[in-house]
């Protein structure tokens, strides 16, 4: 069985959480985290996360901490999602790069700031549900 590892970031930007609104022309949009697949050239999960943050939102991250792992078994591939919490140190959308930015068929990615509270999170319909459930239960612990 092949295993595919992905890294995902729940980002804190000041007093807000930062997510991505992902959408396609003529299709529904949804909210998700910054992140993607770990590539063979990534030194480790953290390096992959930092690369994805730069590619998708042009962000430099502070220290990262893994808080949740979700395993999605499949017939041919098992996907392991590693979720990290990190502060955004700076962000410049003009620094975005990577395949997502070059191929319109992959949709668009727009950063969205959300208040650091349960009500705002519930309104997002954040995917996947395991992450949304975890955040609703623990978000109070993330306040400074």
Model regions and ranges:
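Conserved N-terminal beta-strand and adjoining loop/helix that marks the start
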Residues: 1-18, 69
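Short connector loops at helix/strand junctions that flank enzyme active sites
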Residues: 4, 12, 33, 77-81, ...
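Conserved Nudix-box catalytic region and its N-terminal flanking loop in Nudix hydrolases
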Residues: 16-56
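Hydrophobic pocket-lining residues within nucleotide cofactor-binding pockets
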Residues: 38, 61, 88, 116-119
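A short coil-to-beta-strand element that immediately follows conserved catalytic motifs
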Residues: 60-68
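Active-site-adjacent beta-strand/loop module that shapes the phosphate/pyrophosphate-binding cleft
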Residues: 72-100, 109-117, 130-141
């Amino acid at each position: 069985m092949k295993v595919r590892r992905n890294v995902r970031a729940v980002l804190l930007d000041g007093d807000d959480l930062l997510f991505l609104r992902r959408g396609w022309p003529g299709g529904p949009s949804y909210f998700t985290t910054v992140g993607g697949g770990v590539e063979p050239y990534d030194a480790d999960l953290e390096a992959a996360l930092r690369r994805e943050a730069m590619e998708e939102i042009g962000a430099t991250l502070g220290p990262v901490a893994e808080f949740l792992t979700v395993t999605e078994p499949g017939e041919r591939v098992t996907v392991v999602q590693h979720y990290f919490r990190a502060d955004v140190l700076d962000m410049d959308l003009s620094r975005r790069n990577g395949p997502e930015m070059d191929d319109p068929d992959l949709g668009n990615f727009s950063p969205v700031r959300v208040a650091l509270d349960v009500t705002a999170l519930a309104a997002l319909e954040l995917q996947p549900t395991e992450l949304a459930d975890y955040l609703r239960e623990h978000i109070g612990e993330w306040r400074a």
